[in-house]
Amino acid sequence: MRPRLVIATRSVHKLRELGELLRLERAELLSLDDLGVPGEPVEDGATFQANARIKARFAADATNLPSVADDSGIEVDALDGGPGVWTRRYAGPQATDEDNNAKLLGALRGLPVAERGARYVCVLALALPDGRGPRGGLPMILRRGTCRGRIAIEPRGAGGFGYDPIFEPAGEPPGGRTLGEYSAEEKHAISHRARAARLMLPVLREHGF
């Protein structure tokens, strides 16, 4: 029987992307919906790290299985690091990706390229179901990845999700391709989530996944 690992999300995009990034052939990856987990954790942390911890602990306690949680978002220099932990709800609790993108573009309207710097941030947290951290008592393990770039003038590309259509990764010229125009393979080579996943993978391997 393959070991079971919960990916503490209801986002089909995050579940698919983390599955592709972690490539845990020996493990069965399950979402909260796969396991019929009701309710949602209260994401009231002030940082990505805090919210990743909250979500990982919620999932591990609810399922009695090891759980990996992702908390991620975008930090814009001109907004003093905003939207930050409010990334998903930037334009409101029920906002779509398009709503959030439009609000961010509006907030930066008129700013020159040099002032549109931003970075994607991802924190992954691993929690075990009995309150222990990995390796029998150490604190919950977290891994962090970032991807530097800038906010485009307008959306381009239908790939990815979130703010990908308005995020030009570092290395692209102004007006160059956004993450929404990258293939999945290209995105996985540089994205914040990919970098965090590469750092978390040895930890998961160590624990039999």
Can you name each region flagged by the protein language model?
Residues R2-V6, R10-S31, L35-F209:
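Anionic-ligand binding patches
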